[in-house]
Amino acid sequence: MYDRRLAIESVAHVGPGQFILGFECPEIASQCRPGHFVMISVAESIDPILRRPMAIYRVLRDASNTPYGFTLLIEVVGCGTALLEQKSVGDHVEVLGPLGVPFSLPTTDRVSGEHLLVMGGVGSAPFPLVAEELLKSGHRVRAFVGARTAEALLCVDDFRELGVPVEVATDDGSEGFHGYVVHPLQGYLESEDPANAVLYACGPTPMMRAVHEIAMTRNLPLQVSFEAPMACGIGVCLSCVVCVDAGDN
C-alpha cells in the first residue's frame, strides 16, 4: 500500500457523467490485482475532506509488460465525483492504494468451468481486469452488463476487444434485453446449464441480492465486490461494514 501525490496523465469522457482518469505510478500498478481499489482525494481544500474509493479499471504496461500505471473508471454520483470530473491533465490528487481484497481467481493448473461476470452501472469497472486475468490463465469468460440506458452502459467494448461474449440489458430497453441484467443471466443458466460455472458480481444492491439468490438456488460459487461509501479504505473506521453470514465484515 502506497500513499502518493500523483499527476493526472489522461482524462477521457466515455459517457454522460462517466470518465476515465489515468495515472503513472509503478509502485501501485505493480501491486494491483483484479478487485483492488484506491482512495483518491477530490479537492485541494478540506471540503470535501474524505477521499473517494475507486476500483482499479485497467493496469497500464510498457512494451516489456512491466506495470507502470493504472486507470480509474468513474461515474458522477455526488459532489466528490463531480469535482473529479472537473479535473484536467496535470492536476494532482492524493492516491492511497491498492486497497481491499482482490477477487480469488483460479490459475492455469486449476482450469474450471465458465466464469460469469455480472455487473450493473459503474460496478462494471473492475471486470475488464478480471476478464483479462482469467483469459491469460486459459479460462472461459462471459459478461452480463446492465445499465439504466444504452448511454450508461460501461465496459462492453472492453469485453468485446478481449473476445469475451457479452449479454447486455438496459432498464429502458434502449439496448439489449429490456429489463434487469439478472434476467439474461438466469436465461443463460437455464438454457446452457454450464457445468462448474463461477459467478462474480458488482453493482446495485438489488442486483447483487438477485445474483446471490441465483447462486444459492443453483449451488454455484459467487464472489462479490461491494460498492460502499467509506472514510479510510482499510476497515478502521467501520463505515463500509456489511452484514455477512459470519457477522459484520
Predicted regions and their residues:
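Short, charged beta-turn/beta-strand-edge "cap" motif at the junction between a beta-strand
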Residues: 43-47, 97-102, 246
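Local cysteine-cluster metal-coordination motifs and their immediate loop/turn environment
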Residues: 126, 205-206, 227-249
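Active-site donor-binding loop signature of nucleotide-sugar glycosyltransferases
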Residues: 25, 171, 242
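Ferredoxin-reductase
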Residues: 2-89
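Alpha-helix termini
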Residues: 62-64, 189-195, 245-247
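FNR/FR-type flavoprotein reductase catalytic core
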Residues: 79-229
